Amino acid sequence: MGIEGVLEKGFITTSADKVLNWTRTGSLWPMTFGLACCAVEMMHAGASRYDLDRFGIVFRPSPRQSDLMIVAGTLCNKMAPALRKVYDQMAEPRWVLSMGSCANGGGYYHYSYSVVRGCDRIVPVDVYVPGCPPTAEALLYGIIQLQNKIKRTCTIAR
């Protein structure tokens, strides 16, 4: 948490920014936006072997209850407005994790007329997880990188 000082009487001094960011990293609630085979790996990461619950990550069915969107799979042009609409319904602060080659840049279908060449053209992306499909370990590493990014953000001074 970055505690600056611990006094002898049991007091801890720190900044409000660090406390807020610490609480946000321990309670990420992702909204699944599974579009293709990467969604299977995302479900695998939520199962008992990797157990995202131990990191405080609980998958939510509604965008109004979530603060992290995991875009997993090929995003087509018809699905792009729905992705933006779901993103706009999420509460602030919100983060986006792009999972897989198709979500990152179109992947195997990059030159298709109906595929968006990266979900970052529709919503701002915070973390990219490469792979086709990326493993559950790669998704877990991407979530840990997002938690590190959240810890470094300046919350109150915005």
Curated annotation (Swiss-Prot):
The listed locations are:
Cell inner membrane
Required cofactor(s): [4Fe-4S] cluster
Q: What is its main location?
A: membrane
Single Gene Ontology BP annotation = electron transport coupled proton transport
One cellular component term (GO) for this entry is: plasma membrane
Q: How does it sit in the membrane?
A: Peripheral membrane protein
Q: Which GO terms describe its molecular function?
A: 4 iron, 4 sulfur cluster binding; iron ion binding; NADH dehydrogenase (ubiquinone) activity; NADH:ubiquinone reductase (non-electrogenic) activity; quinone binding
Q: Enumerate the PROSITE patterns for this protein.
A: COMPLEX1_20K (PS01150)
Q: Which Pfam families match?
A: Oxidored_q6
For the keyword Transcription regulation, the answer is: no
Q: Recite the UniProt cofactor note for this protein.
A: Binds 1 [4Fe-4S] cluster.
Q: Which UniProt keywords apply?
A: 4Fe-4S, Cell inner membrane, Cell membrane, Iron, Iron-sulfur, Membrane, Metal-binding, NAD, Quinone, Translocase, Transport, Ubiquinone
The question of whether Repeat is a record keyword is answered with no
Which residues make up the binding site for [4Fe-4S] cluster?
C37, C38, C102, C132
What does it catalyze? a quinone + NADH + 5 H(+)(in) = a quinol + NAD(+) + 4 H(+)(out)
The Enzyme Commission number assigned here is: 7.1.1.-
Role this protein plays: NDH-1 shuttles electrons from NADH, via FMN and iron-sulfur (Fe-S) centers, to quinones in the respiratory chain. The immediate electron acceptor for the enzyme in this species is believed to be ubiquinone. Couples the redox reaction to proton translocation (for every two electrons transferred, four hydrogen ions are translocated across the cytoplasmic membrane), and thus conserves the redox energy in a proton gradient.
Q: How does it assemble?
A: NDH-1 is composed of 14 different subunits. Subunits NuoB, C, D, E, F, and G constitute the peripheral sector of the complex.
In which family does this protein belong, per the annotation?
Answer: Belongs to the complex I 20 kDa subunit family.
This chain belongs to the protein called NADH-quinone oxidoreductase subunit B
Q: Which organism is this protein's natural source?
A: Laribacter hongkongensis (strain HLHK9)
